[in-house]
Amino acid sequence: MTKIPYKINLSEDELPKYWQNIRPYMQEAPDPFINPVTFKPCTADDLRPVFCDELIEQELDNTNKFIEIPEEIRDFYKMYRPSPLTRAYNLEKALGTPAEIYYKFEGTNTSGSHKLNSAVAQVYYAKQQGLTHLTTETGAGQWGTALSMACGYFGIDLSVYMVKVSAEQKPYRKAVMETYGARVIPSPSDTTEVGRRILAENPGTGGSLGCAISEAMEVSMKTDNCRYVLGSVLNHVVLHQSIIGLETKLGLDKYGVQPDIVIGCAGGGSNLGGLITPFMADKLEGKNNIHFIAVEPASCPSLTRGRYAFDFGDTGQTTPLMRMYTLGSGFMPSPNHSGGLRYHGMSPIVSKLYHDGMMEARSVEQTKVFEAATMFCRCEGTLPAPESSHAIRVAMDEAIKCRETGEKKVIVFGLTGTGYFNLAAYQAYNQGTMVDYVPTDEDLEKGFATLPKVEY
């Protein structure tokens, strides 16, 4: 039997030439976006003032299973892709488990995460359309960094609204984004109408991704030749991230390995959706029975404690309405250290798959997450991002179950990025000052009270 190497590296020639679209495989596609004024399904014209034309086409495409990746995007991808698929031999040994553990590492670029996969695609299409300026939000900073890299490469101006608490926790993220040419504004800010309103209603707030989205959208609609781009949640972002799963499946197929469990952290859902796409497509066609697990923070539990309802994607309630698992656009998450998971909602694709019983969701508290992150970095040598460490936590839990039952399951998880800008969080954990935040039912009800009444 061929020994599986520590790292399974694909060649440059094996880089996927197509993204995979999960929606055509689903028995029932996610509900369409709803125009919050007319309460009718959004058309391309409804979305055109905010998003790039080609991205709108991808967003609304429920038909094509594969979409070709333009050569210019593939050329950019080759600077950091294919990314390594690693067999976690050292972690397996430390856990004393018969399970095989694999992780797909997306932190091999300067942004430190998977976010660059969609950033380069979105900026490329903006450039093709002749746009000169983009706006966006960022939580932990990986998306903002990725987009600043892509904008610097293609020569487009960028304004980034960064969740305030994350900006304070990770000041050097701002320096990196500015080095690539971006303008970075902590959110909520006094530079927008919605920011000023949120500050007035929630003095001292640390902000949220929903709030930052509102500010970025407001600026995009008031700036000439400008569009807004989003780093997660939307269908086209999940599409671009499918390259993660496609490479993962190709690497495993080389050695005849079939996963039993696939695990991903879930904030907006794009990395999870991208990782599971080819495996879920096969499951939907009856070709496997993989168990999928979405892992979210206990402090922002949209899947495990949220409601499946139409909701706005932003705090300012300016986006189209999306049917998703949500805590309500007015929900303000506690200032936990997983900035990239501080979002009230969830990808409509991931939400629909979860609602249809195609995957499980778990929430974990951050002290348990950092316990797993610490063990992982000591075994595997990579300092993981807090977001990624949610998947590590559950992968370890599943491996421990295998130790107890004697089952030799194959566990695959997404290591979405590195934690080098999260050292304050690691320091808090190491010093024993980290505190778990879990919203009460009363806290959640405040968010649910902001849900719009929609009949569709």
Language-model-detected regions and their locations in the chain:
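Active-site/ligand-binding loops adjacent to catalytic centers
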Residues: 68, 198-236, 244, 256, ...
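A short, small-residue-rich loop immediately preceding and capping a beta-strand
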Residues: 118, 129-165, 258-272, 292, ...
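Active-site-proximal loop->helix
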Residues: 135, 143-206, 302-312, 423-431
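Alpha-helix C-terminal capping segments
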Residues: 121-131, 145-157, 178-179, 276-286, ...
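Active-site nucleophile and cofactor-binding loops and adjacent substrate-binding regions
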Residues: 105-116, 134-144, 234-237, 263-268, ...
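Claisen-condensing/thiolase-fold acyl-transfer catalytic domains that form or cleave C-C bonds
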Residues: 266-274, 366-432
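Positively charged, low-complexity intrinsically disordered leader regions
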Residues: 3-131
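Buried hydrophobic positions in well-ordered alpha/beta secondary-structure cores of metabolic enzymes
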Residues: 84, 103, 115, 122, ...
